[in-house]
Regions:
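Short, conserved catalytic or adaptor-binding loops enriched in Gly and charged residues
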Residues: 1-6, 65-67, 170-174
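Conserved beta-strand scaffold positions in the cores of enzyme catalytic domains, especially
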Residues: 8-12, 75, 156
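A residue-level signal for conserved active-site and pocket-lining positions in enzyme catalytic cores
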Residues: 13, 42, 79, 88, ...
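ATPase catalytic-site recognition across NTP-hydrolyzing enzymes
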Residues: 18-78
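Gly/Thr-rich phosphate-binding beta-strand-loop-beta motif of the actin/hexokinase/Hsp70
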Residues: 69-93
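Mg2+-dependent endonuclease catalytic cores in nucleic-acid-processing enzymes, primarily RNase H-like
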Residues: 95-208, 227-241
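Acidic, Mg2+-coordinating catalytic module of metal-dependent nucleases/exonucleases
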Residues: 207-229
């Protein structure tokens, strides 16, 4: 209030101050994070998200050729769009690592023609190319498309669409090489180089552009993390206005 002095106590803790973490675990987390998340979760700073969302990712180093030989499991992630682009990613698993091996990216503005749900379902059929797909993880707002896929016999799961937590989980899995982007996924790699934090919002939120492959990759990562046990993901600390 005006005319009164309000006392405040500021306490600063770092990850090293947590007695519940062994030195080995602390070292693992220190290797896991970079940039803003390192400053927050390791150094204990209240840092704003800025710059590229996946600033640690170097396509020349981190994008990989599609591995030769068979994959054990297959899944597809989908970010639905009619006016905005549609993105589908085909993921194959080998030795505990999931590779994004192929993609469909359809931009109706660029192509000059919108597609129907049935036409998008046909694209999914061609992407799957006869492989046994465990499930299709879809943008939860795409109700009509989800119904079209289910009518065609696809096993569909509505994605967890928590953006801030999903970005952290995706970053963790990329850094751990639990998910790998293959060099065949050109539109996904293009978006990786353009996907930025929106510094105008005052909270952890990316700009709503160059985010279609980014969204479906996030859907896949959240689905994968949800079925894992004993994994680590910080999902409780976020910056708000």
């Amino acid at each position: 209030m005006c005319g009164k002095t309000v006392g405040a106590l500021r306490l600063h803790f770092t990850m090293a101050d947590n007695p519940g973490l062994s030195p080995e675990i602390r070292q693992r987390y220190e290797r896991l994070y970079t940039g803003t998340f390192y400053r927050r979760f390791v150094l204990g700073e209240w840092a704003a998200a800025q710059g590229l969302v996946y600033d640690f990712f170097d396509p020349a180093r981190d994008a990989a050729p599609v591995p030769e030989g068979p994959f054990g499991r297959w899944r597809v992630s989908v970010d639905y769009g009619t006016v905005n682009p549609l993105s589908m990613g085909l993921w194959g698993e080998r030795d505990g690592v999931w590779y994004r091996v192929e993609e469909v990216y359809y931009d109706s503005r660029r192509e000059g023609q919108q597609k129907t749900d049935a036409e998008y379902a046909d694209m999914l059929e061609r992407l799957a190319a006869g492989r046994e797909i465990q499930r299709v993880i879809v943008d939860p707002s795409a109700a009509s498309f989800i119904e079209t896929l289910r009518q065609r016999g696809w096993r569909v799961k509505k994605a967890n669409n928590d953006v801030a937590d999903g970005i952290r989980v995706t970053a963790d899995l990329l850094r751990q090489r639990r998910i790998v982007l293959c060099d065949t996924c050109r539109d996904c790699l293009r978006e990786m180089a353009l996907y930025c934090w929106d510094e105008r919002t005052g909270r952890d939120a990316p700009r709503k552009e160059h985010d279609h492959a980014m969204d479906e990759m996030r859907y896949f990562a959240m689905d994968l993390m949800g079925e894992r046990s004993g994994g680590f993901a910080v999902t409780s600390v976020r910056r708000q206005a």
